[in-house]
Amino acid sequence: MKLSELLSAYSIETEFSNDFEVHALAELDKATPNDISYIDQVCYLKLLKDSKAGAVFIRKKESSKVPKSMQALIVDNPHLAFAKVSHAFKIPFFKNPQSVNEPKHFEKVTIMPNVVIGEGVEIGENSLIYPGVVIADGVKIGKNCILYPRVILYQNTILEDNVIIHAGSVIGGDGFGYAHTALGEHVKIEHVGIVRIQKNVEIGANTAIDRAVFGETLIKEGVKIDNLVQIGHNCVLGEHSIVVSQVGLSGSTTTGRNVVFGGQVGIGGHLHVGEFTQIGGKSAVGKDLPPNTNFAGAIPAMEIHEWHHFLAHLRTNFRKQQKTSLLQKAKGFFKS
């Protein structure tokens, strides 16, 4: 689709000089000359210098930063413009829904009844697919994988070898991404990325891992994820990390290797947790955490030694207040 056609289709008014063929939406640092990107935060302006994107949605006050090799598509709300045009690149779950009824054959794979498989799916030998599993178009499954009942793999999801996914989990669903109009309406951002799960990963029941806006949501080798976990779009979980039940990772959270998330931990978006760091249950993390540390506490999470001192201080002061209150009551009783 030509740039002019794309902008016209979604009623986006902006000036441009080169009406090139648009192939995709992409991150600035990974874009090609036929891709469009956007900037709605000043911190990303530094990426413009080395970007190969053909065009970028950007506000007028920041447009002078755009290099001559790239077109500045000046709009009031770059995020909203990006959300609108993303609908032109939506990837269907099943491109040809009728094809799911056609028989498909996979060598040395056990597929039980009532499994639904789309077009272009690859499944490695010795994999086991239980009843009720749904596999969308373009999914690639490695060797020795096990998908328990009612697992759903969205389009183009990649599972490497020896991956186990327990019942009811959804891999590759839409991330929670919306742009907002001046009237407060929410415009959905179509996610055109994927989820990649590397080898020897196990995922518990009823867990959701959202696909990337573009690029990959990546679960690295050896990660173990419990039941009822939510992992947002574009997250990266480092090798051999452990994620306990009811953890929620907001979009673009990244971690080093061997990180441990205790139950019900919540992580704000676009944060990094360093390798070998452990976070105690129910902690709320709102900043980057350094490697090789232990954190705990509700809001906000703090280094575990600080948390212990805080609790001790809180307990001591509370007991002092209780004693003071009892003495005051006793004095009042004897005076009466």
Curated annotation (Swiss-Prot):
Q: Does the entry annotate any disulfide bonds, and if so which pairs?
A: none
Per its record, the protein catalyses: a UDP-3-O-[(3R)-3-hydroxyacyl]-alpha-D-glucosamine + a (3R)-hydroxyacyl-[ACP] = a UDP-2-N,3-O-bis[(3R)-3-hydroxyacyl]-alpha-D-glucosamine + holo-[ACP] + H(+)
What top-level class of enzyme does the UniProt entry assign?
transferase
| Record keywords | Acyltransferase, Lipid A biosynthesis, Lipid biosynthesis, Lipid metabolism, Repeat, Transferase
Write out the coiled-coil annotation as residue ranges.
none
Name the Gene Ontology biological process terms: lipid A biosynthetic process
Entries under Pfam families matching the protein: Hexapep (PF00132), LpxD (PF04613)
Q: Name one GO molecular function term.
A: N-acyltransferase activity
**Which pathway, metabolic or otherwise, does it act in?**
Bacterial outer membrane biogenesis; LPS lipid A biosynthesis
Q: Which Gene3D superfamilies match?
A: Hexapeptide repeat proteins (2.160.10.10), MurE/MurF, N-terminal domain (3.40.1390.10)
Identify the InterPro entries for this entry: Hexapep, LpxD, Trimer_LpxA-like_sf, UDP_GlcNAc_AcTrfase_non-rep
A single GO CC term, please? membrane
Q: Show the active-site residues.
A: H233
* UniProt EC number: 2.3.1.191
What interactions and quaternary structure are annotated? Homotrimer.
Q: What does this protein do?
A: Catalyzes the N-acylation of UDP-3-O-acylglucosamine using 3-hydroxyacyl-ACP as the acyl donor. Is involved in the biosynthesis of lipid A, a phosphorylated glycolipid that anchors the lipopolysaccharide to the outer membrane of the cell.
For this chain, the family text in UniProt reads: Belongs to the transferase hexapeptide repeat family. LpxD subfamily.
What this protein is called in its record is UDP-3-O-acylglucosamine N-acyltransferase
Q: What is the lineage of its organism?
A: Bacteria, Pseudomonadati, Campylobacterota, Epsilonproteobacteria, Campylobacterales
Q: Which gene encodes it?
A: lpxD
